[in-house]
């Protein structure tokens, strides 16, 4: 089988002479047409520090492809900064960017008959967008994560971007001085790289090591460090070899490898967004995987990493402690990973982990042995009940008791809720309900980091519940339940909640319940009318029309 089995459709034969003319304009030589064409999907952007350090990785990948006797074809992919758009209408474009990125990569890879694709990304939706594209096209591919940011520091305290969000609540509550507020603001993000805790970007990139689609150790490297550049080059070399072996994404992305990825997400205390994204990745790969599978894995896998947002450390600390391979070796030895899954190197996961120590080093407390796990079960619980018949996702780490029953405080938009929080109108025992923010209703299922961080900054993180059909940032912790499905816009029960209704969140019982009699709910349902769509033109309108429910990944195909 030729190495250029796809690109030969666009480069070989008399009829393709005009095509070759255009390649000659790019500097190609005649002998290049028998070599594979390797796309380099470059997410470099100066929109956000998450992506501002990607060009050097793309340059390294291009050089490595050339050195491997293949032809690099670099093209761009867009990004949205979740952190910068948070709390604004711009946040509605975040999840949509996942689909746009996937479509961009699919369009270039398929339209140009690429033989393989190196995907390079940084901010949150870059990772699932790229992986969806690779799974959907089944073109040989590898994911190169841009790397994490280094922690900031103010007065001896390590900072992340979440420090800035929480400072808003602390400052408005009078619990932080103006000097400290500005000091945190100026110092939270000192370098290029993605947000530093086990937030969404680091969650997804870490899980890609376990999935088998990224090189070991690559997900916890810091973007400014030379090893990140070296890893990008090595990733490109590995991808060219995968093309020559005809090793495709769907050979790697299987039900068992997704289970491995989810196990690592649970063990590291990762983001709720991973639930949505792995439902979408599985859909793209044609793998049967449901929201209930996350709960099945959660009940088996303990949390063994002490990482922000609910823990103490950041990704650079995890890297120094042994990285994701150390986490995986512990899980593998405990029978919690499938070691026979093939990886992008062609080796099995067990073979890749053969030289990793069986136990974490004793001189660190970032990665813990299973017998000293922070939590005996995973932290992303799937709740169901009359308020979420299809399911909802709760993040239950960092809480003394993940149970609350209290009066509903109902808001149909994020800004109204934020105003109420900052004005001290939300009290201990309340359950905030933010609705009409789901995939169709938002549209785009915006994240709620600003209000949840404000609640924590006000000192209410343990005592106020938060329920939404939108999403939460990977930086969120507290009594939070998101991804409520069915969403309000399609008439889900969350649309029927009224101010003062009693709501129960019980992570132990995996219950999300509106404590209102059935006959009253039936009366409200009969009176409910679907609101007009917020957008009727453009990408938001298209997404709202096409998207599935959150319980199926909010996919558009």
From Swiss-Prot:
Q: In which pathway does it act?
A: Amino-acid biosynthesis; L-isoleucine biosynthesis; L-isoleucine from 2-oxobutanoate: step 3/4; Amino-acid biosynthesis; L-valine biosynthesis; L-valine from pyruvate: step 3/4
Q: Is the keyword Ubl conjugation in the record?
A: no
How the protein assembles, per its UniProt entry? Answer: Homodimer.
Q: What is its EC number?
A: 4.2.1.9
CC cofactor note: Binds 1 [2Fe-2S] cluster per subunit. This cluster acts as a Lewis acid cofactor.
- Summarize where Mg(2+) binds, as residue positions: 82, 124-125, 447
Keywords in alphabetical order, please. Answer: 2Fe-2S, Amino-acid biosynthesis, Branched-chain amino acid biosynthesis, Iron, Iron-sulfur, Lyase, Magnesium, Metal-binding
Instruction: Give the encoding gene's name.
Output: ilvD
Matches recorded under HAMAP family? IlvD
Instruction: Give the binding site residues for [2Fe-2S] cluster.
Output: 50, 123, 195
For this protein, the record's InterPro entries field holds: DHAD_IlvD/Edd, Dihydro-acid_dehy_C, DihydroxyA_deHydtase, DiOHA_6PGluconate_deHydtase_CS, ILV_EDD_C, ILV_EDD_N, IlvD/EDD_N
Family classification: Belongs to the IlvD/Edd family.
Q: Which reaction does it catalyse?
A: (2R)-2,3-dihydroxy-3-methylbutanoate = 3-methyl-2-oxobutanoate + H2O; (2R,3R)-2,3-dihydroxy-3-methylpentanoate = (S)-3-methyl-2-oxopentanoate + H2O
Domain of life assignment: Bacteria
Q: Please describe what this protein does.
A: Functions in the biosynthesis of branched-chain amino acids. Catalyzes the dehydration of (2R,3R)-2,3-dihydroxy-3-methylpentanoate (2,3-dihydroxy-3-methylvalerate) into 2-oxo-3-methylpentanoate (2-oxo-3-methylvalerate) and of (2R)-2,3-dihydroxy-3-methylbutanoate (2,3-dihydroxyisovalerate) into 2-oxo-3-methylbutanoate (2-oxoisovalerate), the penultimate precursor to L-isoleucine and L-valine, respectively.
- Tell me which residues bear N6-carboxylysine: 125
This chain's protein is named Dihydroxy-acid dehydratase
GO BP term (any one):
L-valine biosynthetic process
**Family matches, as SUPFAM superfamilies:** IlvD/EDD N-terminal domain-like, LeuD/IlvD-like
């Amino acid at each position: 089988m030729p190495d250029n089995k796809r690109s030969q459709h666009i480069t070989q034969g008399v009829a393709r002479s005009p095509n070759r003319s255009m390649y000659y304009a790019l500097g190609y030589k005649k002998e290049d047409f028998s070599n594979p064409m390797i796309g380099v999907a470059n997410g470099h952007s100066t929109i956000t520090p998450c992506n501002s350090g990607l060009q050097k990785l793309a340059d390294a990948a291009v050089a490595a492809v050339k050195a491997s006797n293949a032809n690099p074809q670099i093209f761009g992919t867009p990004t949205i900064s979740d952190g910068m758009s948070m709390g604004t209408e711009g946040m509605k474009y975040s999840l949509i960017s996942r689909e746009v990125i996937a479509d961009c990569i699919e369009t270039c890879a398929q339209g140009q008959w690429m033989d393989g694709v190196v995907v390079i990304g940084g901010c949150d939706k870059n990772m699932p967008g790229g992986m969806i594209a690779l799974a959907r096209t089944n073109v040989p591919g590898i994911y190169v994560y841009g790397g994490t940011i280094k922690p900031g520091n103010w007065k001896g305290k390590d900072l992340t971007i979440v420090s800035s969000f929480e400072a808003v609540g602390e400052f408005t509550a009078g619990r932080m001085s103006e000097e400290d507020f500005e000091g945190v603001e100026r110092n939270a993000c000192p370098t290029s790289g993605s947000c530093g805790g086990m937030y969404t970007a680091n969650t997804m990139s870490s899980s890609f090591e376990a999935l088998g689609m990224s090189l070991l150790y690559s997900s916890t490297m810091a973007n400014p460090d030379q090893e990140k550049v070296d890893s990008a080059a090595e990733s490109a070399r590995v991808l060219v070899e995968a093309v020559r072996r005809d090793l495709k994404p769907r050979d790697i992305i299987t039900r068992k490898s997704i289970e491995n990825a989810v196990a690592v997400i649970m063990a590291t205390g990762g983001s709720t967004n991973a639930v949505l994204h792995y439902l979408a990745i599985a859909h793209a790969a044609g793998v049967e995987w449901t929201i209930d599978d996350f709960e099945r894995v959660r009940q088996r896998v303990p949390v063994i990493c002490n990482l922000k947002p609910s823990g103490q450390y950041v990704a650079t600390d995890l890297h120094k402690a042994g990285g994701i391979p150390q986490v995986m070796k512990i899980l593998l030895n405990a029978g919690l990973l499938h070691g026979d899954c093939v990886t992008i190197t062609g080796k099995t996961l067990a073979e890749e982990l053969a030289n990793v120590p069986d136990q974490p080093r004793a001189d660190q407390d970032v990665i813990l042995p299973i017998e000293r796990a922070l939590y005996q079960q995973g932290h992303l619980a799937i709740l169901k009940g009359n308020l979420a018949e299809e399911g909802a996702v709760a993040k239950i780490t960092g809480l003394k008791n993940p149970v609350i029953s209290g009066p509903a405080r109902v808001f149909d938009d994020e800004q109204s809720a934020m105003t109420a929080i900052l004005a001290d109108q939300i009290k201990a025992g309340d359950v905030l309900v933010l609705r009409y923010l789901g995939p169709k209703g938002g549209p785009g299922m915006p994240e709620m980091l600003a209000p949840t961080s404000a609640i924590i900054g006000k000192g209410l993180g343990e005592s106020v519940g938060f329920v939404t059909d939108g999403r939460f940032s990977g930086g969120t912790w507290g009594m939070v339940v998101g991804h409520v499905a069915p969403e309000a816009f399609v008439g889900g029960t969350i649309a029927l909640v009224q101010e003062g209704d009693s709501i129960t969140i019980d992570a132990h019982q995996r219950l999300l319940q509106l404590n209102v009699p059935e006959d009253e709910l039936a009366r409200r349902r009969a009176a409910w009318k679907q609101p007009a769509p917020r957008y009727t033109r453009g990408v938001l309108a298209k997404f709202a029309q096409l998207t599935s429910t959150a319980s199926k990944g909010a996919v558009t195909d």
